[in-house]
Structures are given as structure tokens and as C-alpha cells.
Amino acid sequence: MVKVSILRLLTSCLLIVSSAAMCKPASDWFSNFKNDATPEQLYHFLYMLPKGGDLHNHLGGSNFSEWWYELAIQPERNGGYRYYTRTVINLCNGYGTNEFNSAPQSLMFRTIQHSNYNTLSECEKSEYRLMNELNLEQKTAWLNSIRLNKDFEGRSEFFEKHWSRLNDLGRNPIIAAEMIVKNMQAFAEEGLTYLETQISAFNRLKSDGSVYSGNEVIDLFRQRLTQYDAIDTGVTTRLQQSLLRFSPDAEENLKRNYRLADSN
């Protein structure tokens, strides 16, 4: 079996590591293995290796569609927000609009909160439907719109469409706090004991459309993570303040991040 053969390879090197003449340097045997192994062998080998610091977790991209929907339609759990999503396209702004920004008018299932819905024109409002009023077909399509469930979907769909569709949902810190706990619960079932995830405390929207301060968001996270169901998971969780390194104001944001981390 592939798994057994790889374990034997690792064990044999570990047992005789004291004898350099009997065990080739790691760089040699790994290079040979990498060049000669089948894709299946490489997959199993990397799957079994302990994972290092190069791996990281983005909270915003770690949540199931069902979790997003569940929280979107429950104001009593999401902080009193109501969400609308685009179910039809009426080209309210005509032809020739910028379809490469974060809010293209041709993007189905772009989700907005009620404060932003109220700023739309009547034509634009006609494209959107309250999320808890979606019919079964629309709900299923919305759930699938933030899954990679088709053969032609991949990296571009994930990075260029999913985030734009989630939109205001991803800016609600109360939903974000619930998602942290949902991840802790799900990972606990798989035996995980430590979770370190990236999330930004900045640019989070209140239900009236105003913006939370970073410290206000961190306080919301603290309050949620001290509740019994979070503690009961047994998962130690730490949060990293994320930074988009290629944004025009990356250096200023980095300074802001350090100030926030220092004060907390």
C-alpha cells in the first residue's frame, strides 16, 4: 500500500539517522521521491506530514453556505440585520458599466443589508429579494452560488465571485463571531484542539450602515467567545488581524493593525 510504503521510508530514515552513511540527506531522498513518485503517492505523503506555518486559515472563506444562509435570515441572531440578494438582472444602469469591480451589475446573488438596500433606485430594488422570502429554487441557487459545485468553477470563481456575492454578510461582526464558534464546533468534532484564523476587525458595518471601530469589533468577538458553547468545544482559538498586502494603503493599514494589536 502507498501509505505503508511511505511510512516505512520515513521510519527507516528515522531509525538510522545517526549514521549519515546509511541514510541519505533529506534533500537527496526527498528530491528523488518527488521526482519518481506518482501523483497519488505525493498526495498521500503530503497528507500525512505535519503541517507547518505556511498554512493559514481565512475565516471568511471557511464557512458553509448553509451557515451563511441560516444567519442571514435570523435577525435575532445576526444583530438585527435584514439581508437582500439579487435574483434578477434588469440592467438598471444600462450598458457599458464596469463589470470588473467588486459590485458588477451583472452579478447574481450579490447580498446587501437593509441600510444599503434603502439607497438603491426603484429599478435596482426590483432586482433584489429579502433573503427569508426566497423560494426553494432561489434558495438553492443562492446556496450553490458560494460553492464550487461545477466542473468549470475554480480559483477565479472563488476569489472573484464568492466574496462579491457575500458582500455585506461578510462585514457583519456578529455573524463573524458566530462563524468563529461554528468553526470551533466543527473542528472539535474532527479532533482539532487549536485554531488560529485570519479576520479583520476593520470596515465592519453596523445595521444602520455606519462603521464599527476595530476595538468595538474585538469586544464583540470577546463576548461571543466567552459563552459556554464556545468554551465547551475545547478548541483554543486565536485571531490574526489580516492585511491585504497589495492594497494601495497597505503600509498605513499595517501601522493601524499594529496599534490595534498593541491595545488588545
Question: Would you name each region that the model predicts?
Answer:
Residues 1-10:
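Bacterial N-terminal signal peptides that target proteins for export
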Residues 16-20:
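N-terminal signal peptide c-region/cleavage motif recognized by signal peptidases
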Residues 23-264:
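Metal-cofactor-binding active-site regions of metalloenzymes
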Residues 11-15:
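Hydrophobic helical h-region of N-terminal Sec-dependent signal peptides
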